[in-house]
Amino acid sequence: MHIDTTAAPVAHAPRPFYRHLYFQVLCAIVAGALIGHFYPETGEALKPLGDAFIKLVKMIIAPVIFLTIVTGLAGMGTLKGVGSVVGKAFGYFLTFSTLALVVGLITANVIRPGAGMNIDPASLDASKVADYASKAHESSLTGFVMDIIPSTITSAFVDGNILQVLFVAILFGIGLILIGDKGKPVVALFEAISHAVFRMVDILMKAAPIGAFGAFAFTIGKYGIASVVNLATLVGTFYLTSALFVIVVLGTVCMLNGFSIFRLISYLKAEILLVLGTSSSESALPSLMEKMEKAGCKRSVVGLVVPTGYSFNLDGTNIYMTLAALFIAQATNTDLTLQQQILLLLVAMLSSKGAAGVTGAGFITLAATLSVVPTVPVAGMALILGVDRFMSECRSITNFIGNAVATVVVSRWEGALDREQFDRVLGGEAGGEVAPIHDLHGAPAGLRLNEASAD
């Protein structure tokens, strides 16, 4: 009797909801919030769980960026393609970063969250923000540009500086383009290494619920829900403004480019919850790059747009800066003319680039902006220090979504978006049908990346 061994494989049954990463992270956030609220000391003690997860992710970011960019650029084959992607990406970044600043400025003038507080600047404890102010003075646009160049090639990876790794990767990728066929063995080697590195990303993402649990328990335990109540108008205004920016502004951009912002958010829900839990958009950077490529964006575009966007396309941080600056002015009864507000916006445009990539960038950049615009008292930052931690989650999520949208849009502009695959993946029809991203000719089936994907 002949047995047919060529029959089509049986479709995999859908996994139970509790095995999806987004559900696990959501449960972890809720559990962390409860622990932090009812057992604050225990919540604070769980901080190492969140810190450890962030360190694990940062450990893998440099190789992910380097390998993605180098193999992507080598695949382009020409320097013209590199210049085209970079030009369109920075055009997008400048446009929407500026728009985010304007939205924050308009919202602050309309809602006026600081009006009626009547705070005397002299009564504020400026020592609380002294460290942030000193860091702001240390950072400058020139220093930022010089910091992009690493002391050595290896120091970029040792320090984990995203922009330095990006700089080295672009130079190396261009070098491979210029040597042509001689570079093919190197590209093949890096393709193989990237396969293993992205499998590591899958493994690390399985620890995401633990990291989110520890980080959120610490946040609630240390700062408490009560600290938000006193400045609820500011926090609420910021969350509302960020939501409107994502839905209206970014949503319109998505619509004009033929896709839905809500479907994109649904596709990235696990990563968004991870960003919420850890208050760090960086924690989801490797996973974002993987998912954008899986959705049909060309690797070369993903490799250039996502890492640079993390420094130059900070929509959430920009909304926060102008909104917080005007809140401080209103709370301290400091009247700003239209010209002064425009100056504030222009300074914020520059300082947001000069302080990119710095730990606590949002608060430091605000200090840098206020120090250049002396009309608004820097000491007023003490007013928002207690709730800044609760606004950082919203900043990070808005930054994250903004960079995801930028990647898809620039890919479409470049003709580097597989539209059929993109629609299928965002429509939830991908299942196991999408080919492995980092496929290797002849690689054993068990080595395929997406089989180990947490979500």
From Swiss-Prot:
One of its GO terms (molecular function) is succinate transmembrane transporter activity. Coiled coil: none annotated. One of its GO terms (cellular component) is plasma membrane. The chain crosses the membrane at residues 20-40, 59-79, 91-111, 160-180, 209-229, 231-251, 344-364, 367-387. It is found in: Cell inner membrane. It is a multi-pass membrane protein. Keywords: Cell inner membrane, Cell membrane, Membrane, Plasmid, Symport, Transmembrane, Transmembrane helix, Transport. Its main location: membrane. The keyword Transmembrane applies. GO terms for biological process: L-aspartate transmembrane transport. Responsible for the transport of dicarboxylates such as succinate, fumarate, and malate from the periplasm across the membrane. Belongs to the dicarboxylate/amino acid:cation symporter (DAACS) (TC 2.A.23) family. This is C4-dicarboxylate transport protein. It comes from Paracoccus denitrificans (strain Pd 1222).
